[in-house]
Amino acid sequence: IDNEQPEIALQIFEMNVYAYPKSARALQGLGEGYMETGKKEAALVYLKKSLSINADNPFVNELISDLEEKNN
C-alpha cells in the first residue's frame, strides 16, 4: 500500500475486488489495505472471504490470526 496516499491505494483495491469479486488475491489485497489503514474489522471480513476461496494460504491465515489476537 502506498504510505503517502493510503486512501487512493485502498480505492484501487476496492475497484479490483469490484472487477474480480471471486479473486482470492484481490480480496486479500483489499483486506491488507484495510489492515494498513487501521480498519481492522473490514480487514478481517475480506481476509476471511479470501481464505474461503483459497484455504491453502498460510499468509492470510497468519494475518487473520494476528488481527484476531489484537482484537482480543
Predicted regions and their residues:
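Conserved structural position within tetratricopeptide repeats
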Residues: 14-18, 51-52
